């Protein structure tokens, strides 16, 4: 019984410590850009795959969206076209519906944001890349899924 009580106390202490951590800040394009920068700093190997996105300045995905719709307001994106046949796209969002990962997001909503890094080949009309759940406190990827969309 004493052991059970100790385990319960430890769980409460952990929950209390985690409650003090701030939620991911996607209140502005600057905050979203900082989150993307933090991701690239924590994962420098990704910059070789998406070389232009580490310097990308994010903007609201739907600037005309009403402020009541926080899911849309908390989605930022940018794109870079290094040549006529290729486009790199970055998306940072707090909207789990956007990424189709509603269940996994419930476990990490206080700590993580969605990031999608995509490469669009205009000639092949093909979109590839990955989407991931990035923990802003531990600077760790919680989940990553590859994306491939072809005609």
Question: Each predicted region: which residue ranges?
Answer:
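Amphipathic, interaction-prone secondary-structure segments
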Residues: 71-98
């Amino acid at each position: 019984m004493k052991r059970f009580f100790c385990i319960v106390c430890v769980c409460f202490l952990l929950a209390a410590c985690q409650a003090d951590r701030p939620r991911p800040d996607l209140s502005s394009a600057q905050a979203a850009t900082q989150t993307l920068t933090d991701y690239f700093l924590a994962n420098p190997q990704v910059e070789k795959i998406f070389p232009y996105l580490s310097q990308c300045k994010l903007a609201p995905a739907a600037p005309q969206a009403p402020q009541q719709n926080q899911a849309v307001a908390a989605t930022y994106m940018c794109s870079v076209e290094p040549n006529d046949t290729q486009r790199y796209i970055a998306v940072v969002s707090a909207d789990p519906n956007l990424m189709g990962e509603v269940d996994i997001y419930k476990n990490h909503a206080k700590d993580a944001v969605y990031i999608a890094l995509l490469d669009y080949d205009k000639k092949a009309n093909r979109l590839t890349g990955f989407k991931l759940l990035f923990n802003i406190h531990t600077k760790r990827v919680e989940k990553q899924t590859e994306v491939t969309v072809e005609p």
